[in-house]
């Protein structure tokens, strides 16, 4: 603690992250599980990215967005898990105020990018299935890059806004965060100044970055389902529903966990449920996305096989 009377600056120099478990025996188990999940996530997502880069058949808009999703998944799990593994190894549970802000910024940057990227992927499927004749012109490489660039810009603005707003709050103790990473709901509960403005910003951001994209995704897929049902070929319907079903599964898991985390700001204390949802958001989702979305795809599997046997090269 570094109290500064008469100023509006924080008095907390570091936070104590209570983590997932407190007993030493369980910490060893958690360390092994997290390390395994991290390695699987990195391996799976980098494999997808490599396949998209080297296989000409995968040089299509859908796979361009999938490659970007893989990069996001690697970033999302890297923001939280390596630091947690380090704390488990060193048996230190503290994180500095600046490191906490940095983790918060990058977490919201990547989560916000996820929102917009999933929306762009829904738009891509809408054009491919409902507007096939104009798909190649309306979803050309320039449009793809513009969608990704706009997504990064909006996500960066959102993350920076929340981070700056958090620096205006006073933290004068206690400094124990009942979580395994720094996030807004848990930090709001520790602030000894009013969090109304920060919470208002969070709800506005939720409307812009969660509700609006979710409505757009729902409307897009309503049109997609109507178009798919008009396909006479059973094989064509199956292929279309398979692609759309994978995307909707990812959307459902991502938005479901996000709503649970950020729509419960009125609760007095963080609970173990918040930690479980946090594990889903930062560990399980990035690990499952390659399996749900890409590794079930025969084209991706074929590209990975060629990469492994040396028929394709990254150079």
UniProtKB/Swiss-Prot annotation:
Ranges facing Cytoplasmic side: 53-60, 124-143, 224-240, 296-315
InterPro entries: GPCR_Rhodpsn, GPCR_Rhodpsn_7TM, Olfact_rcpt
UniProt entry tagged with the keyword Membrane: yes
GO BP: detection of chemical stimulus involved in sensory perception of smell
Keywords of this entry: Cell membrane, Disulfide bond, G-protein coupled receptor, Glycoprotein, Membrane, Olfaction, Receptor, Sensory transduction, Transducer, Transmembrane, Transmembrane helix
Parts of the chain on the Extracellular side: 1-29, 83-103, 162-199, 265-275
Ranges annotated as spanning the membrane: 30-52, 61-82, 104-123, 144-161, 200-223, 241-264, 276-295
Cross-referenced Pfam families: 7tm_4
GO molecular function list: G protein-coupled receptor activity; olfactory receptor activity
Keyword Glycoprotein: yes
PANTHER family, per database record: OLFACTORY RECEPTOR
Family: Belongs to the G-protein coupled receptor 1 family.
Identification of the protein by name: Olfactory receptor 3A2
Name of encoding gene: OR3A2
């Amino acid at each position: 603690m570094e109290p500064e009377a008469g100023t509006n600056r924080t008095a907390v120099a570091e936070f104590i992250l209570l983590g997932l478990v407190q007993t030493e025996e369980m910490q060893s188990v958690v360390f092994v599980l997290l390390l395994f999940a991290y390695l699987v996530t990195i391996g799976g997502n980098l494999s997808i990215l490599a396949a998209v880069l080297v296989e000409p058949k995968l040089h299509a808009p859908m796979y361009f967005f999938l490659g970007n999703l893989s990069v996001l998944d690697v970033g999302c799990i890297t923001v939280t898990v390596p630091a947690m593994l380090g704390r488990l190894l060193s048996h230190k549970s503290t994180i500095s105020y600046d490191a906490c802000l940095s983790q918060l910024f990058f977490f919201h940057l990547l989560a916000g990018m996820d929102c917009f990227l999933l929306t762009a992927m829904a738009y891509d499927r809408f054009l491919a299935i409902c507007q096939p004749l104009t798909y190649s012109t309306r979803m050309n490489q320039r449009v793809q890059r513009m969608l990704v660039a706009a997504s990064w810009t909006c996500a960066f603005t959102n993350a920076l806004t929340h981070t700056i707003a958090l620096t205006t709050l006073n933290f004068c103790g206690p400094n124990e965060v009942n979580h395994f990473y720094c996030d807004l709901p848990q930090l709001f509960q520790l602030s000894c100044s009013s969090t109304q403005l920060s919470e208002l910003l969070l709800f506005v951001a939720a409307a812009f970055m969660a509700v609006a994209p979710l409505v757009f995704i729902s409307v897009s897929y309503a049109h997609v389902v109507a178009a798919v049902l008009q396909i006479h070929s059973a094989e064509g319907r199956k292929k279309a529903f398979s692609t759309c079903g994978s995307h909707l599964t990812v959307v459902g898991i991502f938005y479901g966990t996000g709503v649970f985390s950020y729509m419960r700001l009125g609760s007095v204390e963080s609970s173990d449920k918040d930690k479980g949802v946090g594990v889903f958001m930062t560990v399980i989702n990035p690990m499952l996305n390659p399996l749900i979305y890409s590794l079930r795809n025969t084209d991706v599997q074929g590209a990975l096989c060629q990469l492994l046997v040396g028929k394709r090269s990254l150079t």
